[in-house]
Amino acid sequence: MRCLFLFFTCCFLFHSSAQTLTLVELNCENLFDCEDDSLKQDEDWLPTAVRSWTPKRYWRKQNHIAQEILSCQEETVPDLIALVEVENDVCLRDLTKRSLLRNAGYQYLMTESPDVRGIDVALLYQPLKFRPICYDTYHIQPIEGMRPTRDILYVSGLIASDDTLHVYVVHAPSRYGGERATRPNRQLIANRLIEAIQQLPENAKVVIVGDFNDGADDPALQFLENHSLVNITRHTTGSHGAKGTYRYQGDWGSIDHVFVSSVLLDFVEQTYINDAPFLLEEDKKYGGVKPLRTYIGPRYQRGFSDHLPLVVRFRFGPI
């Protein structure tokens, strides 16, 4: 575990009767740069590949991700952003320093996982609202027949109310190969999370966020709930027709979730899906609307992501 030596200034240690903290989770749908990494299978994301992943498309994607984040709440930017499916530090540096987010002041921590495609998870944070104390990455040892997967990112930090928040960012193994056949792969993630949380102090304020590739009632997520974690986004919807963060063959569902320890329940003020109209398109085959994604197979759609942002607002202070 890496611990950060921080010098706290008066601009961070402000106090009032209550402090809000907004968390956003977003699967970016393949935020890759345009350069070939010889150590990863990223050949689909090059200018010469079938998807024609050019610098122009890359920068449009960066600004689209920034737009999604900025549209998650009015007046101020989100305080914490858990991102899934980002390739590397280059992508995050461009997102935070050169995209439409460049003036927002975000800093970030991310994993460097053995995933064969090279995708990782990251946590963006506003330094005046969340100050990291320690961070670590938890490697998942594959079982027989399982490809190397994404590490879990762990970050503990101080928020403005002087509470310590323990944040875990997850991108669980996919269902490729069949849900039942791959179920043990996702159970590994749940097991590792519980092992980690059991090492924390009693009544620790824990947030687990990410793409679990499972629904709320699937075994791995039920395992988390059986260990005193609460899925606070189980029934979360949007205000423009989204009944989940993801739509497959006309059916809305949520494989993106936020779990918290029970001690945090009283501090949850609101949960919602950001389904702003510009993030949606008509579903001509099944009716209704669906996320306006970047690609459908190799066909470029000029969109945002195949997932919608999941938003949680906490209020810390006197209850």
Explain the meaning of each model-derived region:
Residues 28, 80, 86-166, 170-172:
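Structured beta-strand-rich core segments of catalytic domains in phosphoester-bond hydrolases
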Residues 195-206, 214-319:
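Metal-dependent phosphoester-hydrolase catalytic domains
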Residues 153, 157-237:
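Extracytoplasmic, non-cytosolic globular domains
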Residues 49-56, 77-83, 110-111, 141-143, ...:
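Second-shell loop/turn segments in exported
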Residues 1-20:
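Bacterial Sec-dependent N-terminal signal peptides
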Residues 88-90, 116-118, 175-177, 213-219, ...:
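Active-site environment of divalent metal-dependent phosphoester hydrolases
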Residues 32, 69-76, 82-85, 90, ...:
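Sec/Tat-exported extracytoplasmic proteins
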Residues 18-99, 103, 109, 113-119, ...:
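N-terminal, active-site-proximal structural segment of metallo-dependent hydrolase catalytic domains
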